[in-house]
Amino acid sequence: MGNKLVLLSGVHGVGKSYFLKDRFACDDRFVVLSASDLIGRFKKADDAGDKKVYDVQNNQQILLTELLNEKNRVSKDIILDGHICILNETGTSEYIPEKFFLDAGVNGIILLQDDVDIIAQRQDQRDGLVLDKNIIGEMQEKEKWYCERLFSKYNIGHHVIDSTCEYSKFCKIVDRL
């Protein structure tokens, strides 16, 4: 144990925050941080509810600064609720820069993925906004591809899970990353 950083990633609406709250409500092994909350400390959300990020580079720099501050402050392993692939202001999927993973010291990535129809339903219930199902599917495939790339270039481990993943299995995955 001791200050490992694992990113829990997935498309908007896959249920990352719910998954973490459901599994870690009474847990003290990990510190769970939200990338959007860390960015929000210094910058008002600018996605206008459409889940598009208007300044990817600036957001990542803010996130990196805040994340490194948190890593210095806590001694437990950190689970970061965030993204490795997002929609930019033009609606095009964009990968989070590789440099972020290196500078932040990300030890591993856990991808939470689910059925496209279920994700679309969650998006509608939560935001009243549903991304095209083809885009959701493409984003999930791009996430997997990017994880493979980060592993082959930098040896950043990854694992794909779904919402049925139990707490004990999740902990074992974190330990292996």
Give, region by region, the residue ranges found by the protein language model.
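Walker A (P-loop) phosphate-binding loop of P-loop NTPases
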Residues: G13
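Loop/turn-to-beta-strand initiation segments
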Residues: V74-G82
